[in-house]
Amino acid sequence: MKVARFQKIPNVENETMIPVLTSKRASELAVSEVAGLLQADLQNGLNKSEVSHRRAFHGWNEFDISEDEPLWKKYISQFKNPLIMLLLASAVISILMRQFDDAVSITVAIVIVVTVAFVQEYRSEKSLEELSKLVPPECHCVREGKLEHTLARDLVPGDTVCLSVGDRVPADLRLFEAVDLSVDESSLTGETAPCSKVTAPQPAANGDLASRSNIAFMGTLVRCGKAKGIVIGTGENSEFGEVFKMMQAEEAPKTPLQKSMDLLGKQLSFYSFGIIGIIMLVGWLLGKDILEMFTISVSLAVAAIPEGLPIVVTVTLALGVMRMVKKRAIVKKLPIVETLGCCNVICSDKTGTLTKNEMTVTHILTSDGLHAEVTGVGYNQFGEVIVDGDVVHGFYNPAVSRIVEAGCVCNDAVIRNNTLMGKPTEGALIALAMKMGLDGLQQDYIRKAEYPFSSEQKWMAVKCVHRTQQDRPEICFMKGAYEQVIKYCTTYNSKGQTLALTQQQRDLYQQEKARMGSAGLRVLALASGPELGQLTFLGLVGIIDPPRTGVKEAVTTLIASGVSIKMITGDSQETAIAIASRLGLYSKTSQSVSGEEVDTMEVQHLSQIVPKVAVFYRASPRHKMKIIKSLQKNGAVVAMTGDGVNDAVALKAADIGVAMGQTGTDVCKEAADMILVDDDFQTIMSAIEEGKGIYNNIKNFVRFQLSTSIAALTLISLATLMNFPNPLNAMQILWINIIMDGPPAQSLGVEPVDKDVIRKPPRNWKDSILTKNLILKILVSSIIIVCGTLFVFWRELRDNVITPRDTTMTFTCFVFFDMFNALSSRSQTKSVFEIGLCSNKMFCYAVLGSIMGQLLVIYFPPLQKVFQTESLSILDLLFLLGLTSSVCIVSEIIKKVERSREKVQKNAGSASSSFLEV
């Protein structure tokens, strides 16, 4: 069987362009051969001009998604709605019966209704498309000798890419460096066990992807270790291309709220069709024109059935999510918007979320008891190390220098141009070395082996040899949590001598560590020696990570509103409690629990004590799962933050998984429901506030739409049963439907968030959106609209002859009622004057547009013919405005009564329940 060496994309401009190597062929070749074929420099990478040249040939590293259905087809598909088809049938029947005016009127109305529905659906799709672009994949790439953080779509064949734990592989890579590398290829091969990766060429195999152990495939996840690889295939030329096309066919599931709206719509449709059928039957029995009754009934079905409700819900949720982006929170899944308002427990990591994650070493304790203070902040060389009033530099003080050496060599971070590339804790140690002029030590050693840091073991170690002394034995350097590092130490350094580590010394170091921790410092221990288990303890460094600005205020606000906050950290008990107390999380009645204690507890026992626990210290991601389960067992809705690979399972288990945008791994971001762009705890509060506001807005337009639907249905039903002439014709009913489903309704979905909403207790997730209180308000509004409209119709019918003026007055009365009803629906608790008449500009424009449209329908001759209206006097309009404002006035009175009652209850000592009382 003949195997092609590579796939080559034709290009008339340049026949010598770099090929795209297949993963099968690349796995069989040596690294040098692959680099030669791709004309790549493994160490320095490509230069910018070469990248541009290759991109022009190969394109971006992304997939060509099949083109969307043309807009005209989407528009035509709107006519497939059964109700629209029935209206078209009535228009055809009107033509056959030579009632051309009616046919034209119905057709114009259909076009308007279909256009509004099309625009709504288009907005919904576009909003959801925008959401998918909020989290672009990124990677680390070497170009022109520098490590760069760039978008994955920028990669071209021949690029050198660096991988670390938690990264998603950005393109197909031929690996040339791999340290303890393990990759999860389940998204590609279906195999759940991570695959170990190597760099050696692989013999020709049967084409099985799993056998290509020197290839990292695009879209797979790095579970362990780190590596470097050369890009051999991008976009559709990667092995993931076909898988991606299949993924595109999957439809996103509907949110619970959308499902409930669908169910509500179906229930209303069922009842509406029943009532409309009765109206047709009664009208026919009373001798009314059957075609007229059919057209009115179908029009009423279009208006009364809130088919646009799920679409408006989607648009509101999507627009709300886009607003959250401005507040630095990316919500990946729409259901989370609903869940945010129910959240009553937040489990937050300390570092980078509650604190700034700007690590700076401020204190050093050597193993022989010497204390050193460190000045300066940030990832730079500005600052000094002071011992007993003297500035130490270089190897002036061996005890301090050995600590700095260990911290510098056992380190993967790089500081370039005052910019950190790596972990903040490691950056603090490099900055310390820079202050002493010892940062070059990192390059003086050749790393032979590495034991990467993990949240489980809480230490990192490297085995090295000095470049100038490679014939000497290897030396190990270790850094990590004191409790773990001290286990590997048998001796300690004392004034240049190596002495046996006694229990007395261990107790002394433990006391110093506790003292530094109680001052809010993160404490790291450092050691070195010939091998693990025979290390010499060198000392401790204290690293400060100050609380973020505004976090304390956010914590206070959330706790007051009934949201319990738990801090989860890998730090010591002293450090954790010191920071928690400073933030207002920890009080005299609070408890703290260690990760080890969580391990020994059953979920049942943990669920009993967890309400009083404010701090979980020395905790790792595996403990988070148990904490979540214990909280959920008590009925809590839990938000959990995370940034590491091991956090992914906990984030999926939480009701709201929150990933860190800056420090979070790709695995973590993928598992999360929400991403904090700036890793700031305050952003969680802003998201909860926005989530509550969005839910309130949905309630507002549900109230508006249902009250209008019920009023329209009731009005025609009563008129038919009372043997009145029809108060509204088909075109007028369709116009009302446009107002009900159109701009005024949608503008209620973008009402600015009430600043007081964050102080309200979390909503019970089991509560229906249609509460008793909301149903009462819907019915009150519907009754007022029906009674007012029937009164106007009866008043105009006193001559017992129905005229265009009669229906125009009735029609305009209903529309004006709708506008005032929309105004009162802007808030369920506050007066329209309190929230501001013009605070929602979109609402003002929507209502103004609707009123202008109504005036055109009344006064513009061509539209008068379509809607069968006639001009009204200014006195008529003033009369209607006075009457229809009653729906808003009554609503305001109800709100006032509710607020007064709530105030009385508060004064009586009634308190909202919260999870803290569970």
From Swiss-Prot:
CDD domains: P-type_ATPase_SPCA. The active site is at residue 349. Residues 1-78, 122-262, 317-699, 752-775, 828-842, 893-918 are cytoplasmic. It is an enzyme of class 7 (translocase). Its main location: Golgi. Monomer. Homodimer. NCBIfam families: ATPase-IIA2_Ca, ATPase_P-type. This is Calcium-transporting ATPase type 2C member 1. The gene is Atp2c1.
